[in-house]
Each structure stands twice: as C-alpha cells, then as structure tokens.
Amino acid sequence: MTRYSRITGTGSYLPPNRLTNAQLAAELAVKGVETSDEWIVERTGIKARHFAAPDVTSSDLGLEAAKRAIEAAGLQAADIDLIIVATSTPDMVFPSVACILQHKLGIAGCPAFDLQAVCSGFVYALTVADAMIKSGAASKALVIGAEVFSRILDFSDRTTCVLFGDGAGAVVLEASETPGILASDLHADGKHVGILCVPGHVSGGQVLGSPLLTMDGKAVFKLAVGVLESAARATLAKAGLLETDIDWLIPHQANLRIMHSTAKKLKLPLEKLIVTVDEHGNTSAASIPLALDEAVRSGKVKKGDILMLEGVGGGFTWGAVLLKY
C-alpha cells in the first residue's frame, strides 16, 4: 500500500511584546533613525510585529507552538518520532534547536535536527518530513519554524529593521493512506548569497564580520516574484491540478506587495490570499506555519481545502508545497 503524509494539527506562538510601527518609530528616533507608520505600511503592509524578551530563545517559542500542534492533532509528545526545526536564529551554534526542544518536550530517542533555508525553511522542512514519512523512516513528525530575528537586526538601518518579527509555528505531519502533501518543488541559487545574509562568523572566540542582517531589497523583490510563480506552477503540474483548484494561497509573509504580485501572476483573487504580515511582520521560517495556524483556527481553512504554501529566502532559496488539508 502506498504511504502518504498529511497535516493533522497546527499550532503557533507569538511573544507577548507587540510593537506597533509608531512605537518602533519612536524607539528608532531616539537613535537618530527616521521612519513612520505611513512609510512602513506603504512599502510593506506591516503595521506591527512581536519581539521576544532578551532571555527567550527560538526553542522557547517553538516549544509553545509545538505543544499546541500536538494537542490539535490529538497526540501526546511521546507519540512524536521525528522533529525538524527550520530556523536561522538557533539558541546556540550547536546542538540544534530541535534537540533542545525535544528535551523541553520531555521526550528522547527520535531523530531531531535543524534545517537552515532562511525564509524558505518551513517548505524545505515540510518536504523533508514528507519524504521521511513516505519512506517509512517516521510516522508522526513535528515540523516547526521558529525565529528570533530581532537579535540579528541592524536598528540603524530603517530599510530592514522595520520588516522582521519573532514567532513560531508548527504542524504535526502523520502517515496517511490518502494523500495530504500532493507535491513540492524546492530550489536554490547560491550566486545570490549576498543579497540577503548575515555575513559574520565565529572564529577564535570572536565574531568576524557583521553579525547583523543585510539585504538588497530591490534585488530580493525582483527575484522573489518570478521564482514564487514558477515554483507554484511546478507543484501544480506535478499534482495535475490548475490554479483554479487552489482554495488558499499561504505564502511567506515578507511583504504585501510581493504577496499581491504572486497572487496576481497565479490569477488568484486576493480573497484567496492568507495575510498575517500586517500583524506579524516577516518572521522568516515561522511565517508560513504561523499564517497556516491562524487560518485554520479562524475557520478560513477547512478540511479538504487545497493549500499552496510558498517560501523564498536567503541563499537564494525558494520552494512551494501543495497540499490537501
């Protein structure tokens, strides 16, 4: 019998500190950096974001999202036999956030590892978990996107520091006799490493190079719109479906203009676009599972709906997953 995988539970968590554009602008003004609510909303669609407290880590955020996803799936933590965490902001250089989170869940033994594809991380992680379940290597996988991007922001650069937020989202992916994950399409092109990166690295007890995020916004925008369309069309072709079969488009929540452009290229009405970037900002690998969980819990996404998940991020990486919820 053919083995498939499907999502059986979703969960998410945002740190309680919500920062509006006006509040962020006031904090930046003290440092001599000028911005405003109008400037941010016009260019990004972002109105607020959440920042974690200094002592809160990606594993802390991921733990809360994981607990909610496990509960939604009707499982216990001990039922999980695979943990994959997509993150670019780990608690430490090593071991992985997944191993730390596994211990916090009170379980041991199952494989646990991190996956780093920046803002594409969740679609990469979901694809890997799907493949492992189909191969028989796992039956109940916990797939998490968790980030504390506030730690790597340059608050003297108004073009980047206003974009990002912290948070976590998670899904439980279980073995199934009927298809849930219908198709996926992943890509990368390393020649674009420099347009979105944190170039610093640790050497001899010191950080060499900048430990803060740097981005060429125009280059990212130009690349993102094209590759998101191509990845979406590739997954549809693999699944034998059409754009009109998509019930909900859940893209990486980076910028409202990119999201609207992608929907337009796929000839999807904006009513089919799940948007959380206005309240969450760009939470990198956490953005897609955060948006998915919010859409499920609000009643928008229902069982049987066809969902297109899309991510694009540093690397340059991009990809899409088409699934039946």
Curated annotation (Swiss-Prot):
Comment block on domains: The last Arg residue of the ACP-binding site is essential for the weak association between ACP/AcpP and FabH.
Protein name: Beta-ketoacyl-[acyl-carrier-protein] synthase III
Pfam families hit by this protein: ACP_syn_III, ACP_syn_III_C
CDD domains xref list: KAS_III
Record field: catalytic activity: malonyl-[ACP] + acetyl-CoA + H(+) = 3-oxobutanoyl-[ACP] + CO2 + CoA
Gene3D superfamilies noted in UniProt: 3.40.47.10
Pathway assigned in UniProt: Lipid metabolism; fatty acid biosynthesis
Species the sequence originates in: Polaromonas naphthalenivorans (strain CJ2)
Enzyme Commission number: 2.3.1.180
Enzyme class label: transferase
Family: Belongs to the thiolase-like superfamily. FabH family.
Any one GO cellular component localisation term in the record: cytoplasm
Function, in words: Catalyzes the condensation reaction of fatty acid synthesis by the addition to an acyl acceptor of two carbons from malonyl-ACP. Catalyzes the first condensation reaction which initiates fatty acid synthesis and may therefore play a role in governing the total rate of fatty acid production. Possesses both acetoacetyl-ACP synthase and acetyl transacylase activities. Its substrate specificity determines the biosynthesis of branched-chain and/or straight-chain of fatty acids.
Protein keywords: Acyltransferase, Cytoplasm, Fatty acid biosynthesis, Fatty acid metabolism, Lipid biosynthesis, Lipid metabolism, Multifunctional enzyme, Transferase
